[in-house]
Amino acid sequence: NRYGVDLDPDKEAIVTIGSKEGLAHLMLATLDRGDTVLVPNPSYPIHIYGAIIAGADIRSVRMTGEVDFFEELERAIRESLPRPKMMILGFPSNPTAQCVDLHFFERVVALAKEHDILVVHDLAYADIGFDGYKAPSIMQVPGARDVAVEFFTLSKSYNMAGWRIGFMVGNSELVNALARIKSYHDYGTFTPIQVASVIALEGPQECVEEVRLKYQRRRDVLAKGLIEAGWPIDIPKASMYIWARIPADYQAMGSLEFAKKLLIEAKVAVSPGIGFGDYGDTHVRFALIENEHRIRQAVRGIKEMFRRDGLLEVPKDTTEEGVE
């Protein structure tokens, strides 16, 4: 029990075919045409398009370093007509790696109760925290189950991407709604995968720490390399991403064209920030999915591109050195 929260497994928990399936079907089960849903911008695409597919109207809530996200959330509620029915959150964030503390969720739950809004929280990166940071669960807030549900996936913590296994916990009415629509759409997750997942969750947890350390080392190598190349970044304290502001000399290109340039000229694949929302167009997302050697190769490619463009005086390449 990682968070000290007791749940009724029959009424307050349901297995999903990964978080993405659960999120999409939950929105189909609970949203109607014309409902308003609050979604951070930038955000993971299913948080946006799951609601759109269900027929709801999206109200983007700006989530950038220049603003206080909670204040933006309050303002969006005040200015929304009709009143929002649901808000979709995900911390640590994909793509921005933004993190919150438990007090943030306490305020969210209070806000949701005040305005009668459902809260859906995607806790995909629960265990991928660095430098002592531990991601909180919204379920730790007393009374959260009155208004909220939370998704967890085994893809990241247990390196089980592709197995398509996760679960949703929290509000019993939302759990029941998801169970009903899933009874029409699928027959559940393949039983051997569920058995393997139980073993993973209940067995020794050293593997989770190994995965976390692997991502932390990759983060360190990439962050060190980008900073050495003259590309200032905010070093994330969680998730498997680095959300990097496009260097000033390339800002006018926008994230899509800059991502193409990196792919063609540096042989480095990143996700353009525009794919996560309008407010993401000033950034690109690096995913820490390659090993440290490949990350160092990527940094060298970026440095070479900067050299050819004559923009930066790149120091001696130290990306082959270890990170202390």
Sequence positions of predicted segments:
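PLP-dependent class I/II
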Residues: 2, 6-324
